[in-house]
């Protein structure tokens, strides 16, 4: 759906079960207007630590200087890598202000009011181009990693979960995924037609997705499963699922 007008600011969400999320925004500074805090229905408060591209570039330069000045430290940071202070203002996905989520902290839990975590619940690192590089859990262990095409900003060519083999992706000239390769699992091929996508796995099973709409409102309205059954879906004007009919 299209973004709300500038004078309308999202302050909270309530789901069908009455559970709430209240959003708190920074009033000033480099991330003014961005959500930097969340309070859930149980009264727990979370701090969202945000960084700008300039802040990440400065941190990179400091890390590189430390690495180069210490003979004992591993050369994990390339001395030739460029980390710009700014990102291109516009991308094929829309405007990019360079602000990224760096960490999520639990700052208050009514069930344990006297306990404060000493580490974030999750932490995120990014490439010099602002792409998500890795996700770390509260123990500091990397749980996800991503690799991108050096010639196409934002195009993910591989990702992996901790302890699992890396999945890789191939694209056509228009930037659509044509193949997903999983070393210890099924591989998938993707073929694109008019308002449809055909997915075939390495066991030659096929599914077909039929779509309607354009841009951000494009939705799958029918799915033909490998066993011949069909699932149909209906959406409202905002693109939200309102009904689904399965083979039964």
Model-derived features with residue positions:
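Extended charged/polar low-complexity repeat regions
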Residues: 1-248
């Amino acid at each position: 759906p299209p973004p709300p007008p500038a004078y309308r600011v999202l302050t909270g969400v309530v789901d069908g079960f009455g559970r709430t999320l209240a959003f708190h925004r920074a009033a000033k500074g480099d991330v003014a207007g961005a959500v930097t805090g969340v309070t859930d229905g149980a009264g727990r408060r979370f701090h969202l630590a945000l960084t700008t591209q300039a802040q990440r570039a400065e941190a990179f330069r400091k890390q590189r200087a430390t690495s180069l000045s210490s003979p004992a430290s591993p050369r994990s940071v390339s001395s030739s890598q460029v980390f710009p202070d700014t990102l291109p203002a516009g991308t094929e996905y829309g405007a990019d202000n360079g602000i990224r989520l760096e960490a999520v902290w639990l700052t208050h839990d009514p069930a344990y009011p006297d306990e404060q975590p000493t580490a974030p619940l999750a932490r995120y690192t990014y490439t010099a181009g602002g792409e998500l590089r890795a996700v770390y859990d509260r123990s500091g262990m990397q749980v996800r990693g991503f690799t991108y095409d050096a010639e196409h900003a934002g195009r993910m060519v591989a990702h992996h979960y901790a302890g699992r083999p890396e999945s890789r992706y191939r694209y056509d000239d228009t930037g659509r995924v044509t193949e997903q390769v999983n070393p210890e699992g099924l591989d998938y091929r993707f073929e694109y037609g008019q308002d449809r996508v055909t997915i075939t796995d390495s066991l030659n099973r096929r599914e077909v997705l039929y779509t309607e709409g354009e841009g951000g409102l494009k939705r799958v309205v029918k799915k033909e499963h490998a066993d011949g059954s069909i699932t149909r879906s209906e959406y409202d004007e905002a693109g939200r699922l309102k009904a689904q009919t399965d083979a039964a």
